[in-house]
Amino acid sequence: MIFDVPDPDFARRIRTSFARQGLTETIGATLGRVAAGSVEIGVPFSAGVSQQHGFFHGGVIGAIGDSACGYAAMTLTPAGAEVLTIEYKVNFLSPGQGEQLIARGRVTKPGRTVTVCTGDVFVVSGGQEKLVATMLVTIMTVGGQRDVSPTMPTTPMREIAAHDRSTPSRWCPCRRLRAIKLGFRVVAR
């Protein structure tokens, strides 16, 4: 598929963004091929990315597939734009048992605001690739914002007191969670 590329310097922008991600650094991920509409990310096997049976953890498989798709979408955004995942669905096809994971994300349908991507995650064992997961990822373009950070709230936080079992049941844990989702900051008394 041939895409219009609004930022000819997209590869540098993606490599810079990738280097700032804490999760990818933590799991040892490396950014491979970066092309218009597609990106490849690899993760070597280690105890830190395994689950109890010695396979790659499903969360790691989903995370690198999501990242590969997100960066594939970002290759088609204008300079200064960022991307955020709206949703993704992953189908696990086989246990991730091998030396390395490789995620390949590609744009299926680009859009000005919403882009749909597909991703495949392979495990490499003995030099052979095996498909372990496939996913559908929906990405939102956040135009012109250089830093989209959860540490910089867009709405002011309001404070409420935490439920201490002696307060009325209206502050039970489920209501505290709801209050947090509504932008309240729960504080202990």
Predicted regions and their residues:
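A generic structural signal for short beta-strands and their flanking turns/coil linkers
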Residues: 25-27, 37-39, 82-88, 99-101, ...
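Non-catalytic linker/capping segments at the edges of enzyme domains
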Residues: 1-42, 150-165, 170-174, 189
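Hydrophobic beta-strand-centered segment that forms part of the acyl-chain substrate-binding groove
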Residues: 71-102, 107
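Residues at secondary-structure transition points
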Residues: 18, 22, 26-29, 51-63, ...
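Hot-dog-fold acyl-thioester-processing enzymes
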Residues: 44-68, 157-158
